[in-house]
Amino acid sequence: MMGHAWLKHREALLALVIILMIGAIGSRAPSFVSPGNLVEMFNDTAILIILALGQMMVLLTKGIDLSMAANLALTGMIVALLNAHYPGIPVVALLALATLLGLLMGVINGLLVWRLGIPAIVVTLGTMSIYRGIIFLLTDGGWVNSHQMSADFLSLPRSPLLGLPLLSWCAIAALLLVGYFLRYSRTGRALYTAGGNATAAYYTGINAGKMQFVSFCLSGALAGFCGYLWISRFAVAYVDVANGFELQVVAACVIGGISTMGGSGRVLGCLCGALFLGVINNALPVIGISPFWQMAISGAVIVMAVLLNERGNRGHGRLILRNAALARRKQAVKS
């Protein structure tokens, strides 16, 4: 029962926990709850939100993409190098290029998983190392710093619009677009079916492998998009940019209730999971707790979330099997 209750109300519970955390920390450090700091905290979490949306779509199909941070680092380095050497290239063109390069890396992951049948975790661990290696080959271990980047390249994510930086609006737009895609498009709904019930997917003409390919393409494109956003926000590009950040991305999804077994999860949960980690990241230094505790806290929450998610999913799986058996009996009676 607890698992079912968690699955049904996880977003509300997470939102409540986030509000309580902000309130508790604000009671000790009033500046933490100032409007400016709350806006900055959301802005700090924006890239995590976008990446988590991409990871969510892969998880829905029973896959996982551990190469997202390496994809981000490689695309970010490429556009940073281009900007440093050819500052006249429009920033919008560089942003589009980063997205297309990320899409290409997603295509590579998707084809290896779909066509060759290699487990997603193996493929993306391999491509993660390959992408990092390519960065080293391109730069010989060197850096691209803010002095080499143009003012337009650095200013775009920081540009204010209706009280929020453009980076925050990118995250909001991604939430709305992915939410619409998963809820109302045929392909979006097929991602759920492909990961949640392979038998139902087969009988309804959905190619589960192809849906995994689509999810990796979308994940790669979002990672590439974030490549420019990350580099321009932090004004530096080097081999180890966002190293290990893929674990934060997976954590945001799992905490938000996206099942690692596929077919279950919502965009709102993904948002709440990312915000939960964002609050922790910003709160620990404020209250004087070592950042290393962040890893321990995140790990404990991930384990708890996985246990609750999978407990609920077992009951959901039994319901699917029961309905499938009933449908087969009805079909047998008709024939």
Predicted regions and their residues:
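Transmembrane helix-bundle core of multi-pass membrane transporters
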Residues: 120-184, 211, 233-242, 320-335
